[in-house]
Amino acid sequence: RQMCIRDRPGARVLDLYAGSGQLGIEALSRGAARCVFLDENREAVNIVMKNCKNCGVFDRSRVNIGEAARFLSACREQFDLVLLDPPFRGGTLEKILPAVEKCVAPGGIVLCESETGIVLPAQTGSLTLQKQYKYGKVLLWKYTKPMQSAAEQEGEAL
């Protein structure tokens, strides 16, 4: 996680299922331009706001309460780094990953965290699985979006 976050200075970050905001705050502390945090739990949202203030990154943060699927369907922004750390069990990650694609900027990265035993696709839309890491009972999935769409690449080849 830290390597991917560190390599994105100036990034626009989306931290879905923010929890305490740890991942997004880490990105901001390593040079991300701004971070949008989302969690559906009011207590978690209050904790994220408090943590952003305590860490001195509140001015580069936008903290929202709401359901991830609804947020993504209405989202008109694109992000360079999307962090997905939903609650384990329940199939949340498998359901939400396809909806994330439209919010990922060309050349963007999606980092997903899950429990072991989960199987995610090697490709979902324009997102391609680059690496999978295992840390004890946790899996980290790194997806990337190409700088150009396949249609744009074909057009240049002609």
Task: Give residue spans per PLM region.
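Class I S-adenosyl-L-methionine-dependent methyltransferase catalytic core
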Residues: 2, 6-158
